């Protein structure tokens, strides 16, 4: 284990703490930055937690927090009188409040509070299992499944009707366009994204049908 910095602690085999008051606990845990905290409480290969950045926090298994105040899970610091290297001392230990597995938070104050989530961007937030938040201030919401819809009395069933999780590029008040999207496949089983030119083509086709109908029937048909 390696500890470098004022009041830095590295507790656990192959753990590393670098920075003023940086704390790492658990096998292979890494904390780098002022008051960075990395806590692994798992066994076997479910270890190796990384927190890099001032006040960054990571806990659980294989979770990563990169950035000032980034969080993959949440921790608290508690004062504890323990025996470390045969010397009784009052030390600060880490206690997990929320552990997450395989979570990644990248960006200042980015936060992931559920397993397998990804938050990328300043203050990006994930609160859903396997959720993805892309861009500053983006936040995930609960996934919504849409298996079918009824339009003018006719039911249409959709491919990919069950949503496993969700990807967000904004939040309730901040919206973003997604540009440079290639044309997706259009068929009954397609789950591709559709771009604007394809919708324009559909609108033109519908308009041509309406125009042909009017020409055949005449009047205001």
Residue ranges of predicted features:
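Glycine- and small/polar-enriched repetitive beta-structure motifs of secreted/surface proteins
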Residues: 1-180, 184-191, 197-204, 208-212, ...
């Amino acid at each position: 284990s390696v500890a470098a910095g004022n009041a830095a602690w590295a507790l656990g085999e192959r753990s590393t703490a670098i920075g003023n008051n940086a704390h790492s606990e658990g096998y292979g845990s890494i904390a780098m930055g002022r008051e960075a905290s990395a806590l692994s409480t798992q066994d076997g290969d479910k270890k190796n937690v990384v927190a890099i950045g001032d006040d960054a926090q990571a806990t659980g298994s294989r979770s990563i927090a990169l950035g000032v105040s980034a969080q993959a899970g949440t921790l608290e610091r508690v004062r504890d009188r323990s025996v470390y290297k045969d010397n009784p001392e009052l030390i600060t230990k880490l206690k997990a409040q929320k552990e997450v597995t395989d979570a990644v938070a990248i960006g200042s104050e980015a936060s992931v509070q559920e397993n397998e989530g990804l938050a990328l961007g300043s203050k990006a937030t994930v609160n859903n299992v396997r959720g993805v938040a892309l861009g500053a201030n983006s936040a995930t919401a609960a996934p919504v499944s849409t298996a079918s819809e009824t339009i003018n009395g006719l039911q249409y069933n959709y491919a990919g009707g069950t949503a496993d999780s969700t990807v967000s590029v904004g939040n309730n008040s901040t919206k973003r366009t997604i540009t440079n999207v290639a044309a997706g496949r259009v068929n009954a089983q397609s789950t591709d994204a559709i771009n604007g030119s394809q919708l324009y083509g559909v609108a033109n086709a519908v308009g041509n049908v309406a125009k042909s109908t009017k020409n055949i029937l005449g009047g205001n048909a």
